[in-house]
A protein has these predicted regions:
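Polytopic transmembrane helical bundles with strong interfacial aromatic enrichment
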Residues: 1-182
């Protein structure tokens, strides 16, 4: 009943969205201005991203507990699982680059928001008989999770291209460092 009342993934999509907007503003500001308070604020936002990831994980665990099977039995569950894998890889890879975590947070927000479109049913359903095999379940989970790093690498590639476009003689040194981080 609490799960249905709070709708954790709809709330998380909003929180990831707000956090990604803040990260975009302050990480881009951090590239051009080296201020201590901006660095501290970015670190706080990174911690908030970790907290949201923990809540995302708890939401997946609660879906697993309620349904009695792994949460990738329909399109809605697959999308929220892909969003989880995007954030997992974003946090893992983004330890050294706040731009990577910013891109992961933005992409996670978009992915979770797309899971709540009208054509997807968030109902907790029974596992499809074809997925009843343990080996097939592991195979599907790995294949579906692999979309996370694929989407993240696409966004990071686009971000690198934008940084290259906006590189001038004045900011070449800083931009080269950020491009190498990505």
């Amino acid at each position: 009943i609490l799960y249905n009342k709070y709708q954790p993934f709809l709330s998380l999509s909003k929180y990831y969205g707000y956090l990604s907007l803040l990260l975009i503003v302050f990480v881009i500001t951090q590239i051009f201005y080296e201020k201590k308070w901006i660095n501290t604020l970015v670190k706080v936002l990174v911690v908030l991203a970790g907290v949201l990831f923990i809540l995302h994980t708890l939401g997946l665990i609660s879906r697993w507990y309620i349904s009695g099977n792994a949460p990738w039995s329909n399109a809605y569950e697959s999308i929220i699982y892909v969003a989880w894998s995007i954030m997992l890889f974003g946090l893992t890879i983004g330890r050294k680059s706040s731009l990577t975590l910013t891109a992961a947070t933005f992409l996670t927000a978009i992915t979770l928001a797309s899971a709540h479109l009208n054509w997807l049913d968030p109902e907790i359903a029974n596992l499809m008989p074809v997925l009843n095999s343990w080996w097939l379940l592991v195979h599907v989970s790995i294949i579906v999770a692999s979309y996370g790093p694929l989407f993240l690498s696409m966004i990071l590639g686009l971000l690198s291209l934008f940084l290259i476009i906006f590189t001038t003689k004045k900011n070449k040194k800083k931009m080269d460092i950020n491009i190498k981080e990505l």
